Amino acid sequence: IETTGSDQEWYDYTAKKWANAKTSDGSMWVWIPRYAYSITSGYHKSGADINSTAPEEGAGTIEVEFMKGISSESSTGRTNFQNVSGEGKWNIHPAFNYGQTVSGIWVAKFEASNSSGKIKVVPGVSSWRSITVNDIYTNCLNYNKTLNSHMMKNDEWGAVAYLSKSKYG
């Protein structure tokens, strides 16, 4: 799909139509919009089958409400967030604050591969192997300094994981 920055219909998370983008080097990215979440069942519990869809057997249930940009209001009008741990508590995910609040983050759609010593994110190729954490960090920083590219942080990974376990995933 080709689109412009003003096209409001190029993605629809409710319909599981993800905002995918391809950069000039062919790398593929997906937009993770800022959201609030609540773990509504299974908080701090483990099950026999982590992949089960039954909360009593698996990883529990996560509800997600997308935020309106960088405001403190969700798409449903919720403005009260506890931002504390616990089942049933609503939290604005911390991954969307990297020195300042952002409306979302671009995440590599696939594991990074090596193309002549440069990062490339494309399907169907082997992941970059035999690289030190220091070199991963440096390569990620240098990918696009203007856009603040960096090695994924734990909370950003958590944002992707939580979203994938919600009804949108």
Regions found by a protein language model. Name each.
Residues S46, N51:
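A motif-centric signal for short, conserved binding hotspots located
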Residues S38-K45, N114-I119:
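Short, solvent-exposed loop/turn elements at domain surfaces
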Residues I1-G42, S149:
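GGW-centered surface loops in extracellular recognition modules
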Residues K17-W18, G42-H44, D135, S164:
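Residue-level detector of solvent-exposed, low-hydrophobicity positions
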